[in-house]
Amino acid sequence: MLITPEKLYKQRRNFLKLGAGALISSSVLASKLSALNFTSDTNPNKLEISDEELATNYVNFYEFSTDKRKAVSLAQNFNTQNWKIDISGEIEKPLTLSMEDILKFPLEERIYRFRCVETWSMVVPWVGFELRRLIEMAKPTSEAKFVKFTTLLDKSQFPDQDALFPTIDYPYVEGLRMDEAMHPLTLLAVGMYKKALKPQNGAPIRLVVPWKYGFKSIKSIVKIEFTKEQPKSTWESYAPSEYGFYANVNPNVSHPRWSQANERALGDFFTKPTLMFNGYEKEVASLYKNMDLKVNF
């Protein structure tokens, strides 16, 4: 079930165009976000939005650190000036987008559930635009079956990338099937809580796929590639018996080391049952018709 109703989540809130040659910094984006005319009732189901302080400070961003609190601290000097996103692969013509280009897409707020594979969860008001808008602009060919995403590789900014023994292989890579990428729930986010994304939350731009575990929602994207073959995602490569390509939230498929049947919302003491597809079963179940979700996890 959608948290934000169709009528509201399809409303578009446009940014004013920035002047030619302007640098797109977090502070500039924050000022644009604060000027947006958000509607007062974007959560008619009255689900409790997670505390902003908790949601922005309890994070997984291994490029900075495997320690959630330390990652927040180390992220504070992250430089996103002059950010570029290369778009390539099975498309009519490769292109590079600046954040100025990105901010030309109509932005909107969407309130989504977010479920981590570690069994914690939250409800976040994201600001962004549907990924399919960018895909339509890129004009993929009939050969494009998947979309591959890559996080920034910069050892000068990411301590774990520069470590003698990095925690995982970098750069971080994720992927979606084309129909998943084109689904209207799939979002490219530039903000949350009506503010620009903080560095630890994936600034300046990240993916949000609300029916999948959080590790699919790749942060700080610098490359989007359209491919013929299914890309090998980072966690799938690291531990294929524990992390599958699809990573759909499924209370009936346990992680090898823990159950996924329940979750604990940030700030709560008690757990609650995990919803199939994180509560978006009606919207996305048809994408996986006739698939064995215990095999394709």
UniProtKB/Swiss-Prot annotation:
**Upper taxonomic lineage:** Bacteria, Pseudomonadati, Campylobacterota, Epsilonproteobacteria, Campylobacterales
**What are the alphabetically sorted keywords of the record?**
Metal-binding, Molybdenum, Oxidoreductase, Periplasm, Signal
Annotated localization: Periplasm
Post-translational modification as stated in the protein's UniProt record: Predicted to be exported by the Tat system. The position of the signal peptide cleavage has not been experimentally proven.
The name under which this protein is listed is: Protein-methionine-sulfoxide reductase catalytic subunit MsrP
Q: What does this protein do?
A: Part of the MsrPQ system that repairs oxidized periplasmic proteins containing methionine sulfoxide residues (Met-O), using respiratory chain electrons. Thus protects these proteins from oxidative-stress damage caused by reactive species of oxygen and chlorine generated by the host defense mechanisms. MsrPQ is essential for the maintenance of envelope integrity under bleach stress, rescuing a wide series of structurally unrelated periplasmic proteins from methionine oxidation.
Recite the UniProt cofactor note for this protein: Binds 1 Mo-molybdopterin (Mo-MPT) cofactor per subunit.
Which one of the record's GO molecular function terms can you name? metal ion binding
PANTHER family assigned: PROTEIN-METHIONINE-SULFOXIDE REDUCTASE, PROTEIN-METHIONINE-SULFOXIDE REDUCTASE CATALYTIC SUBUNIT MSRP
Cofactor(s) needed for function:
Mo-molybdopterin
**SUPFAM superfamilies given in the database record:** Oxidoreductase molybdopterin-binding domain
**Reactions catalysed:** L-methionyl-[protein] + a quinone + H2O = L-methionyl-(S)-S-oxide-[protein] + a quinol; L-methionyl-[protein] + a quinone + H2O = L-methionyl-(R)-S-oxide-[protein] + a quinol
Give the EC number. Answer: 1.8.5.-
Presence of keyword Oxidoreductase: yes
Q: Which Gene3D superfamilies match?
A: Oxidoreductase, molybdopterin-binding domain (3.90.420.10)
Residues noted as binding Mo-molybdopterin in the record, renumbered to the chain: Y62, E63, C116, T151, N201, R206, S217, I218, K219
Q: Where is the signal peptide?
A: 1-35
- Chief localization class? periplasm
Going by the record, the broad EC class of this enzyme is: oxidoreductase
The record's note on quaternary structure and interaction partners says: Heterodimer of a catalytic subunit (MsrP) and a heme-binding subunit (MsrQ).
Instruction: Say which family it is in.
Output: Belongs to the MsrP family.
Q: Which biological process, per GO, is one annotated for this protein?
A: protein repair
Query: What InterPro entries does the database record attribute to this sequence?
Result: MsrP, OxRdtase_Mopterin-bd_dom, OxRdtase_Mopterin-bd_sf
> Entry's Pfam families?
Oxidored_molyb
Mention any one GO cellular component term assigned to this protein in its UniProt record: periplasmic space
